[in-house]
């Protein structure tokens, strides 16, 4: 039986069995190999450490059934209209901590076979940092201040370097 991590109440984490939804024509069923925990975001949600007027309060209520934001796995089954993925392919997905997922093919990214799945799992946080670098126009500035030394902050430093920023504080 598939399992997932949920936060039933503030400060509580459990592993529960759940039933997968039926596979639709453009869906893929994925067996998760690794999921990455964003310690800042997930701890904030778990401990309800946010103000009532924030996006966290609007988006996350208890029981919180969708913990986690990124995972990698392999395709176990495909719907009849799936075009670009096949059984056995390794994929990245922005999904919750769970042993299995059923999602649209369009919500998966194929991982090349020579990429280690543990490393590929970082793709989501790298994308978050990239979006910040893009929005901050790192390609046209010489100096940037990055506040935060978590995974996203560290990846923002790497993006700043890749964009050629000379002074990274």
Where are these regions (language model features)?
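Short glycine/threonine/proline-enriched tight-turn/helix- or strand-capping micro-motif at secondary-structure
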Residues: 11-19
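Residue-level recognition of beta-strand termini and adjacent short loop/turns
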Residues: 9-11, 24
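Extreme N-terminal starter segment of soluble prokaryotic enzymes
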Residues: 1-3
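Short, compositionally biased
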Residues: 102-115
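Glycine-rich beta-strand-centered segment in the early N-terminal region that forms part
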Residues: 21-37, 49-95, 114
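A structural motif shared across PLP-dependent enzymes of the aminotransferase-like
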Residues: 39, 94-105
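Mid-domain Rossmann-like dinucleotide-binding core that forms the NAD(H)/NADP(H) cofactor-binding site
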Residues: 116-169
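Cytochrome P450 core scaffold surrounding the K-helix E-X-X-R motif
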Residues: 39-46
């Amino acid at each position: 039986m598939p399992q997932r991590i949920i936060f039933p109440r503030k400060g509580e984490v459990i592993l529960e069995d759940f039933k997968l939804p039926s596979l639709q024509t453009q869906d893929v069923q994925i067996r998760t190999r690794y999921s990455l925990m964003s310690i800042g975001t997930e701890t904030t949600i778990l401990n309800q450490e946010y103000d009532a007027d924030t996006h966290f309060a609007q988006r996350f209520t208890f029981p919180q059934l969708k913990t986690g934001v990124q995972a990698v796995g392999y395709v176990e089954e495909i719907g009849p209209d799936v075009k670009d993925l096949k059984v056995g392919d390794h994929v990245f997905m922005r999904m919750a901590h769970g042993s299995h997922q059923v999602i649209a093919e369009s919500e998966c990214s194929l991982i090349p076979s020579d990429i280690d799945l543990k490393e590929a799992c970082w793709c989501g946080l790298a994308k978050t940092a990239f979006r910040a670098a893009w929005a901050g126009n790192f390609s046209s500035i010489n100096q940037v201040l990055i506040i935060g030394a978590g995974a996203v902050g560290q990846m923002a430093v790497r993006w700043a370097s890749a964009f050629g920023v000379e002074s990274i504080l």
